[in-house]
UniProtKB/Swiss-Prot annotation:
Cofactor(s), names only, from the UniProt record: Mg(2+)
Record gene name: ndk
InterPro entries: NDK-like_dom (IPR034907), NDK-like_dom_sf (IPR036850), Nucleoside_diP_kinase (IPR001564)
Localization per Swiss-Prot or TrEMBL: Cytoplasm
Protein name from the UniProt record: Nucleoside diphosphate kinase
Biological source species: Idiomarina loihiensis (strain ATCC BAA-735 / DSM 15497 / L2-TR)
Lineage: Bacteria, Pseudomonadati, Pseudomonadota, Gammaproteobacteria, Alteromonadales
Amino acid sequence: MALERTLSIIKPDAVAKNLIGAIYNRFESAGLRIVGAKMMHLSKEQAEGFYAEHKERPFFGALVEFMTSGPIVVQVLEGEDAVRKNRDIMGATNPAEALAGTIRADYAETIDENAVHGSDATESAAREISYFFSDEEVCQRTR
């Protein structure tokens, strides 16, 4: 299986609850390496650009408002089958449907404020990583 990279975002609700370390522990315990990370407060324009594919959806305005409501932590995760592994760790989008032991089951309260975002495919991961990180900001891990 090939080494992959995926984008992960710890959303404002989880940052506000001081869950960054707990979520990072989940990534690392699953064998994912954090090869790029930054904390930032998205502008409205940044959030609209990142979620542009949802622009015509009824939840778009609320999503942009939520994602700009406080700081987020954005990271690049690397590992074998990283996209699927991260999605398994996150759990279902709706925390009420997420399996016990997943990030969303343990830390999220609603489908709108669901703690984390993760790329859904290797193609979207590449696009999402480049939205937040330059090549120089992603480290090569050798150990």
